[in-house]
Amino acid sequence: MRGSSNKKIDPRIHYLVPKHEVLNIDEAYKILKELGIRPEQLPWIRASDPVARSINAKPGDIIRIIRKSQLYGEVVSYRYVISG
């Protein structure tokens, strides 16, 4: 067994992990209004997810995820943060 270390690995630095960002209230309201949905209707992400923890997302927040795609350039998706 290796010696324990307090180092924390930031999952956001891996090249396969897309950019995640927490939306502010105004941005979240605008997105929900454009889509015509309630926050609970978005796909969910748990607050315990490594990336959600690294960006300090809390239950009730909405996260914007920006993925790079060879076919479409950038693909934007949203997730609603739930407890767990």
UniProtKB/Swiss-Prot annotation:
Superkingdom to which the source organism belongs: Archaea
UniProt enzyme class: transferase
Subcellular compartments: Cytoplasm
A GO CC annotation given for this chain: DNA-directed RNA polymerase complex
Keyword entries, A-Z: Cytoplasm, DNA-directed RNA polymerase, Nucleotidyltransferase, Transcription, Transferase
Catalytic reaction(s) noted: RNA(n) + a ribonucleoside 5'-triphosphate = RNA(n+1) + diphosphate
Keyword Transcription: yes
Pfam families the UniProt entry points to: RNA_pol_Rpb5_C (PF01191)
Entry's EC annotation: 2.7.7.6
UniProt subunit comment: Part of the 13-subunit RNA polymerase complex.
Database matches in PANTHER family: DNA-DIRECTED RNA POLYMERASES I, II, AND III SUBUNIT RPABC1
Protein's name in the database: DNA-directed RNA polymerase subunit Rpo5
Provenance organism: Saccharolobus solfataricus (strain ATCC 35092 / DSM 1617 / JCM 11322 / P2)
